[in-house]
Curated annotation (Swiss-Prot):
Pfam families: SAE2 (PF08573). The gene is GR1. It is found in: Nucleus. Residues 377-398, 417-525 are annotated as: Disordered. The lineage of its organism: Eukaryota, Viridiplantae, Streptophyta, Embryophyta, Tracheophyta. Induction: Strongly induced by ionizing radiation in a dose-dependent way. Regulated by ATM in response to DNA double strand breaks (DSBs) (at protein level). Residues 377-389, 465-484, 508-525 have a biased composition (Basic and acidic residues). It comes from Arabidopsis thaliana (Mouse-ear cress). This is Protein gamma response 1.
Length: 588
């Protein structure tokens, strides 16, 4: 016996160590996988993308800088060529101005020589005019002398000599007059030329001053261009130095990238080694765990079967409770109907109060029985779950935990609606969530001619089924509760809007009638749930009864959900039984 206890303690100790080892292996595996995931999915792609982006940006910046500096160099060379051309033009203009300046410097000498020549001509003209005057005086004197002495006193020789002298004097005077006219023309021309030369000299002086100003302006511009060229050359040298530094930085980054690639390869190798070790350890751990996993699964299967049996028994109890509440409501409705139809007596009141007391006693008895059964069931499921948890220990198997939670939660969720008393149980409401898009939206006019129409079965209504359903309807009286009166409506939407909640809170102080709001838009009506009225229920019970099988029931519900015309935003008030029966009997 002692050996068995020692073996059990050793087995428990070994199992605990094995679970701790499996947990540590699992934790190491998770950490390694997390490190691998972080490195492979975040660090290395981020670094690689950053390096590629930096290399791309650097190459683009380098190309852009090279292009810009080439453009600047080209523009500077063009400017230098333009400056050279302008310098050549300035030199040629300077030479021309020097020639013109030399000409203007020789102009005063020419003017003085011309002035002397003009004075000489004036003197000569004065002497010739004096000679002409003397000849005229002589001519006039001779004429006077001839008139005084007479022609007969003179000899022929003297007369001829005087005539010849007069002729020669006339010729001289004519010649002198011609020369005088020529000299006057020459003097006038010289004066005009002198005026023209003086104006040219003034223009030359003005041009010389303007050329000097242009020369000074061009000199200053040339100095500014030389300064700009020097500054641009300095900037070009700085940019070339920066390009060289960028090249060195790129080489350093490439070296770092190679080092990181090597480190990544080493990390991958380490990860592969860890994976191999992990697979070996996990294989051993799986071999150890598979032996115990079978027993755990068997215990869980037994516990699940037990919980299913208990849930089935509980469902049967719930069904019996519902049937009992239905019968009580049926008797109560029949009693109230008979009291209203016949005379109201105190005996009937006493009978009604006794029936109500009996119903309350039955409901309390069933409630206490169900609550005790629920406590017993919950304790059994909790003990079974504790046993399973103690057996599994800290193995870390998520699948076993999920199965235990499911087996424990199934009876609790199944018995949750039974907390209410049987007398307060309500019949299942017809309101619900938004109906899904049904395939019955396709009507006959839109179906293909070759396909089968599922609506055809609804037209084949046997008269026997109709009569049978009508006979069953006569014996069933489902009367609404006292709280669900005609002046109150039920909200079809499970989650009302805040505005409707505010309206309901405001209307609690004073009773008001909630009208049956009709929804006329097609899109809004499609979002509402179909409601089955009593006349439609007779038709569906005759065509597809509920007790013929699940297939007919689902077909009936699907057809009703798709084509029902009874759609409301709020549930309409219930009418009393036989309200619409006006007294005409029929086969139905």
């Amino acid at each position: 016996m002692g050996d068995e206890t020692v073996d059990g303690i050793e087995a428990k100790y070994i199992s605990g160590l094995s679970t701790i080892m499996v947990a540590t292996i699992q934790e190491a595996k998770d950490r390694i996988s997390q490190i691998e995931y972080i490195f492979c999915s975040q660090l290395f792609p981020n670094f690689q993308s950053k390096s590629k982006a930096f290399e791309k940006v650097y190459s683009e910046a380098r190309l852009a800088a090279c292009d810009t500096w080439k453009d600047r160099e080209k523009s500077l060379l063009d400017q230098i060529e333009e400056l050279k051309v302008e310098n050549q033009q300035i030199k040629s203009d300077k030479e021309k101005l020097a020639e013109e300046l030399g000409k203007t410097a020789s102009m005063p000498l020419r003017l003085t020589s011309l002035q002397g020549y003009i004075d000489h001509l004036k003197k000569k003209m004065k002497s010739r005019s004096k000679m002409v005057g003397d000849a005229r005086d002589l001519y006039y004197r001779l004429v006077e002398l001839l008139q005084v002495k007479g022609l007969d006193e003179l000899s022929e020789d003297g007369i001829n000599m005087i005539v010849s002298e007069v002729k020669s004097l006339k010729m001289k005077t004519e010649f002198l007059q011609e020369e005088l006219s020529k000299k006057t023309l020459v003097t006038e021309n010289l004066l005009k030329k002198l005026e023209y030369l003086s104006t040219e000299a003034a223009d030359g002086e003005r041009k010389l001053s303007s050329v000097e100003e242009e020369k000074q302006r061009l000199k200053t511009r040339l100095q500014v261009f030389e300064e700009n060229v020097g500054r641009l050359e300095e900037i070009l040298r700085q940019k070339t130095d920066e390009v060289e530094e960028g090249k060195t930085a790129l080489e350093v980054l490439q070296g770092k990238l190679k080092l990181t690639e090597r480190e990544m390869l080493n990390c991958k190798q380490k990860i592969a080694d860890h994976e191999k070790e992990k697979t070996v350890v996990m294989g051993k751990a799986k071999d150890d765990m598979q032996g115990r996993h079978g027993s755990y699964l068997a215990d869980l299967e037994a516990l699940r079967c037990q919980s299913e049996e208990k849930s089935f028994e509980l469902a049967m109890e719930i069904k019996k409770n519902k049937e009992l509440s239905r019968t009580c409501k049926k008797w109560k409705s029949q009693h109230t109907f008979l009291c209203k139809r016949f005379n109201f007596t105190p005996d009937s009141v006493l009978h009604q109060s006794s029936l109500e007391d009996e119903n309350k006693e039955i409901g309390q008895h069933e409630k206490s029985a169900i609550s005790s059964y629920l406590e017993r069931k919950h304790s059994e499921t909790a003990e079974g779950a504790d046993k399973v948890r103690i057996g599994t220990g800290s193995s870390g198997n998520n699948y076993e935990k999920e199965s235990i939670i499911k087996t424990v939660q199934t009876p609790i969720t199944s018995i949750s609606p039974i907390v209410r008393s049987p007398g307060a149980a309500k019949p299942p409401q017809l309101s619900g969530l938004k109906r899904p898009a049904s395939i019955w939206r396709d009507t006959r006019s839109r179906q293909s001619p070759g396909g089968h129409d599922p609506h055809d079965d609804f037209l084949d209504t046997p008269i026997e089924n109709v009569k049978r359903v009508a006979g069953e309807e006569k014996h069933v009286h489902d009367v609404a509760k006292k709280d669900d009166s005609d002046d109150e409506t039920q909200d079809m939407n499970p989650k009302p809007s805040p505005s409707r909640q505010r309206i309901q809170i405001a209307e609690t102080s004073k009773k008001s009638f909630k009208h049956v709001e009709s929804v006329r838009k097609k899109a809004e009506r499609e979002n509402l749930k179909g409601i089955e009225c009593k006349q439609c229920k007779k038709f569906y019970d005759a065509v597809h009864p509920e007790n013929e099988g699940n297939g007919n029931k689902s077909l009936r519900c699907e057809h009703h959900e798709g084509v029902s015309r009874h759609r409301y935003r709020y549930a309409p008030p219930m009418t009393p039984e036989g309200f619409w029966n006006i007294g005409f009997e029929s086969e139905m």
